[in-house]
């Protein structure tokens, strides 16, 4: 039994993909508010009801649309000549309880409450949980033939990263991917711990959307906070 399942995603039409995609966090300062189609408008909305209106507007104008059947999605991002290949699908939260989906980060009650409130009011997950899994070297080569086909999306964002996405519709390719996914025994959460905890605390049966990258493609970088100023003197211990 595979931990990652297909689902019907809500996604932009190809011609709007670059405009809708929100910028990398490092480039948010360069974001121009007049980009009305950008998803960052929805993410930055001060009220949940405003976010819901923006999402509804994008759907009504056919900027974004929901797939009519369940699919896997393959996402490739290229930057500085490095390529990362992610598998986008949904997971069952029961696998969190049985330790097949593992976190590593401390979570905070207030942030979980806020995420839960957003989830219940908005009734949508607007970005995937970022995860990784242990992969045998070069095991993804079995999927190489997929990348001979034209991707459904292919564009370069403001941060110079190239984004490509394939919607897996071919039955043979889907079967091959399902066989590959059977070898993934555990999934590790990289980013999205508070969202997962919020989903666990709702009474709704939620299957979170994730993107899973193999560990041999992921770089683990230090994240250090620096103390540069103390406003008041402190006593020695």
Q: Where in the sequence are the language-model features?
A:
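Flexible, glycine/proline-enriched loop segments at strand-loop-helix junctions
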Residues: 101-107, 164-168, 186-187, 226
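Single conserved hydrophobic/aromatic residue that forms the stacking wall/gate
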Residues: 228-237
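A short alpha->loop->secondary-structure connector
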Residues: 147-151, 204-209
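Active-site beta-strand/loop microenvironment that shapes enzyme catalytic pockets
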Residues: 166-207
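Short helix/loop capping segments that flank catalytic or ligand/cofactor-binding pockets
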Residues: 98, 140-141, 197-200, 219-222
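Glycine-rich phosphate-binding "P-loop"
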Residues: 149-171
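N-terminal extension/subdomain marker
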Residues: 1-150
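Class I SAM-dependent methyltransferase SAM-binding "motif I" and its flanking Rossmann-like core
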Residues: 209-227
